[in-house]
Regions:
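Boundary of Sec targeting at the N-terminus
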Residues: 22-24
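Short beta-strand edge/turn micro-motifs at domain boundaries
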Residues: 152-179
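Surface-exposed, charged secondary-structure patches
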Residues: 109-151, 204-218
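Solvent-exposed loop/turn segments at secondary-structure junctions
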Residues: 88, 105-106, 130, 145, ...
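Low-complexity, intrinsically disordered terminal/linker segments enriched in charged
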Residues: 172-218
Length: 218
């Protein structure tokens, strides 16, 4: 059940980002959370279209695109710690570092696979709000497909100590990707221990990206 939610949310993320893509790279203003989301969107999908011939031959190239264009703006360390939840305090420094790396790889694989679900969509970004003094901001997005109700997305971003912003969660139709994963991971750590969970994530990350016949034309 969770994997379906996760892939659905990741697919919606990339579909929403795709609708803002244009032809030229845009400088990413990490000091403005609203500008950041749109700029990262544009650059990620510009790279996607530029590398489509490579992707057709090697779908795993999508992992490189996600790593280069998307992940620098994802606070995967913060997300990893949130996912570990109450188990964080009982882990060693080495375990935390290994888990963060494994969870980062999991996100890369998840978003790379979501690219294969890409179809042309329309997206609406409501005007940004005043974020001065805020530590966390919700960037709302409406994903629009003809003949269907708009899908409500929310990118949750947080301000870092240097004043820049990074995203750490996606909420799709009220379902938090981070909260869903936290529930699953917490249960697995309790049952198997953190080391086993790390190994399981690492093993998942070794899987290849598979093309989808009903999504992107790769």
């Amino acid at each position: 059940m969770f994997n379906r939610i996760c892939m659905y949310s990741a697919s919606l993320l990339l579909l929403a980002l795709s609708a803002t893509a244009h032809s030229d790279d845009l400088a990413v203003n990490t000091m403005n959370p609203y500008d950041m989301v749109e700029a990262v969107a544009k650059n990620t999908f510009t790279r996607f279209h530029q590398d489509i011939d490579i992707i057709n031959t090697d779908p795993d190239h999508l992992k490189l695109i996600v790593s280069d264009e998307l992940m620098p703006y994802i606070d995967y360390k913060y997300a990893s710690y949130k996912v570990m939840g109450i188990h964080l305090k009982s882990t060693t420094k080495d375990q935390r570092e290994r888990f963060v790396k494994a969870f980062q790889g999991y996100l890369v694989s998840t978003y790379a696979q979501a690219f294969t679900e890409y179809t042309d969509q329309q997206v609406r970004f409501p005007p940004g709000k005043d974020f001065s003094g805020e530590k966390m901001v919700d960037v709302n997005v409406d994903l629009i497909e003809p003949g269907r109700p708009a899908i409500k997305l929310m990118f949750k971003v947080r301000r870092l100590k240097d004043g820049s912003w990074k995203a750490f969660d996606l909420v799709a139709e009220g379902v938090s990707l981070l909260a869903s994963k936290s529930s699953e991971i917490s249960n697995l750590i309790r049952q198997k221990g953190i080391d086993s969970v790390i190994l399981e994530l690492e093993q998942r990350n070794k899987g290849n990206i598979s093309n989808k016949t009903n999504g992107a034309k790769l």
